[in-house]
């Protein structure tokens, strides 16, 4: 948890306690009151864009290991941000997607990281709440909001950090999920993570 400038640990004792917390911050899109704290949500992506690397400490050093362990924890458990009476929670896969999984931006025709958008933030919380309630979720969305990239990011998060995971993807057309479609995103993510992270 980032609380007014300091990182602390927040624990939930039960699934119900965790679910209640997520419900307490779930709102309608446009009502999340993002402030300057939201610049921290994708801080690691911006550092990578600036430096060409995530961590400038020498590989294998204590600071290097601390950095990558801290980021791994956020990618496995999510990150809570608090400031001026507001609280935001980035689920594990959303945090990883914003910071460590670049997407191809069709508007500018190059790879980069996703921007923080309240509609995607809302979708991440909505899908997490469905999972916590053992429910399925459906989403009606507009095109070109990187939804396929995000959902492949959810998969790569599980593949990267959980042992023995089995995942399934379905689509109305085979080309949506084969190497012409979303599978391509998994390959892009794998290549980037192998090249630029310590995981």
Question: What label would you give each PLM region?
Answer:
Residues 1-199:
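Phosphate/NTP-binding elements of NTP-utilizing enzymes
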């Amino acid at each position: 948890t980032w609380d007014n400038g300091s990182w602390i640990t927040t624990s939930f004792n039960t699934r119900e306690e965790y679910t209640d917390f997520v419900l307490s911050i779930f709102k309608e899109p446009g009502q999340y009151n993002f402030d300057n704290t939201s610049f921290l949500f994708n801080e690691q992506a911006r550092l990578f864009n600036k430096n060409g690397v995530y961590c400038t400490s020498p590989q294998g050093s204590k600071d290097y290991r601390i950095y990558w362990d801290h980021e791994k924890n956020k990618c496995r458990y999510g990150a809570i941000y608090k400031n001026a009476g507001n609280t935001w929670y980035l689920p594990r896969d959303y945090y990883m997607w914003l910071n460590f999984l670049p997407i191809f931006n069709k508007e500018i025709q190059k790879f980069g990281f996703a921007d923080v958008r309240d509609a995607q933030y809302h979708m991440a919380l909505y899908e997490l709440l469905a999972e916590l309630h053992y429910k399925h979720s459906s989403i009606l969305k507009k095109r070109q909001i990187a939804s396929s990239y995000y959902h492949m990011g959810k998969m790569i998060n599980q593949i990267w950090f959980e042992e023995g995971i089995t995942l399934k993807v379905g689509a109305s057309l085979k080309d949506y999920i084969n190497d012409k479609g979303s599978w391509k995103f998994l390959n892009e993510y794998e290549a980037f993570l192998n090249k630029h992270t310590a995981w």
